[in-house]
């Protein structure tokens, strides 16, 4: 590497250039010619004589033409002459613009080298500084390094020379890989020096790294030697001590021997452990035949016996994990897991192939000659063993679900294909939507039944299928495996939920008839129960879709009555007829309600198990379709039709009449369905409210008719006066009449005033009172019972007051009985007879 770094000394330098320093000789370059007397120099190039430097003998002549000679001195002489010739040829004038001094120097150099004769060529004149022309010649020939190599040739043996050439050759071969810039490295200037030094640094660093790498390999050995050296030295000292004992008697309390005995015991324990581990290894391994069954065997009972053995090995090898060293247990369990993973993949592929070929197989024997029942048993056993690998087991269930879902969906959709030749398609008819929905649901039910049979034939595990299963699998998956058929059935049927819902929903959402919608609700509920009996879970999507369709139908039923009230009733703002009968819309509306109630009561038992919110005629819905139309529509409409009812008693009588007629109609239509309204307190309150309103209006009508009757007979003023002091209804005996003695001072109670106010009106109106009340006032009441009740109560009140008022006047004026009988000229019997009261 020194040769590489200082290679610039081999080149010819421009001594006229002042920028670069002149190379300094590092070694003595004095040649043989320099030691001779000055005179004519022999320019024949001569290598330093090794023999002369070693033995002080005379210099031997060298043949310059010995390139092919076997003598090493002749070869080196030839190489040196060749280098000088190359230096001479590679350093001509570099540019035309040089000054005359440089040109002169160049010519002088050329002339000097030309005039040199081989015999006068001396190395000392080429490399040693001298005066005149010899100085430039010496500085331009060889570098200090070449002189060093040549002068020290006697110190370098043949192997070193070979190694030097080999190093240069290696650099030449790897210059591209090392990215060597040849021109820069051969540059004799300072840049070349830096490049060669950098190359040397890189080479030394790389060499140092290689040496460190080699030394790193000795570190473990050194550490092991250091770790064992103390023990070895201790053993050595102990052995020397024992051997030096002349008595050959070993003391019993020798600590060293006790320690050796302990080590011996430990060695025996280790041997025992090794024996146990070897026994365990022999026990927990598969032989070659079993391994071949796992790798190349078919899925049969023999295969499952081997798998069972592998699982038992895994279960029984858990105690190895209790050892201080877990490597054995971990290695065994890892190997067993690899075998189980291989077997599970093989079982998985077998199950997939079996599923694809199960439906298509037409004979009872499969490719392996087993019967169909045996194949099913192997299939179930394969499922049991595969259940230990949840990932593959779930993937199998997904494959089964996907395969069967596509199959049943294609079967379902094919029934709506109008071009189908295999079966009659399901056609939607506008005149019979119930039949269409029934056909759709019947088709789904048939598919569910067939699929349930298929799934149970493959995935319904019995105790016989699980009797030979390893305990570890049964403990983890027995419950899950026994319910896998139901889970698979539900997963497969989910593919029908959306298609079924779409075909039914297009009917439900556009059907307005509440009776048809109610039939749809019944049909959906019926098939929902049938689906659940086939194993479909209550929370599955197809059941949820049927429930949502039921809710839509129920909402359509309730919405129909709400829309009816909005569209029909709101258009009729007042009662157009004078007969004070209920509005026509109320009769029609009640007819529609009765029609719904009748069909609902026939199937009321089907909703007994449903919650209150899911019932069609729940208390909330009953309030919506019964109570709210009466409160929000009917009563407001009647109040609007008779705006003067609060001021005019005639108008009020008409309002009360139509209100009584309306509520009597409502009560009569709802009365047959008391059981429907008796399902809870909220529903019961609706009918109670209707009856209370009817009683309220009847009572108001009674009060109003009594008032009219007393006004027509002239007794209204005295009725108010008498009742103000003491109610007439409370008079029981003669003593009660004393309560009215204060009336004697009232001018209205004078007999002449009574005659004036009562006698004429009473005698005029009383004969026609019964006809007037029945014919004119109560004729417009549609209920004869209510009319008779009001009529009877009015005349009873009138008869009672007339009788008490007559007795009161006699009590007040006992001396004027004849005058009293004259004014109130009807006896009690006559009065009652005229007003139609029977005793």
UniProtKB/Swiss-Prot annotation:
SMART domains listed in its UniProt record: COG6
Family matches, as InterPro entries: COG6, COG6_C, COG6_N
Domain of life of the organism encoding this protein: Eukaryota
Ribonucleoprotein is among the record's keywords: no
Cell compartments where the protein resides: Golgi apparatus membrane
GO biological process, one term: intra-Golgi vesicle-mediated transport
Disulfide bridge map: none
Record's keyword terms, sorted: Golgi apparatus, Membrane, Protein transport, Transport
Annotated membrane topology: Peripheral membrane protein
One GO cellular component term: Golgi transport complex
Chief location of this protein within or outside the cell: Golgi
Pfam families in UniProt: COG6_C, COG6_N
Region (Disordered), start-end ranges: 14-38
Family: Belongs to the COG6 family.
Binding partners and assembly: Component of the conserved oligomeric Golgi (COG or Sec34/Sec35) complex which consists of eight different proteins COG1-COG8.
Annotated protein name in UniProt: Conserved oligomeric Golgi complex subunit 6
Organism from which the protein derives: Saccharomyces cerevisiae (strain ATCC 204508 / S288c) (Baker's yeast)
Phylogenetic classification of the source organism: Eukaryota, Fungi, Dikarya, Ascomycota, Saccharomycotina
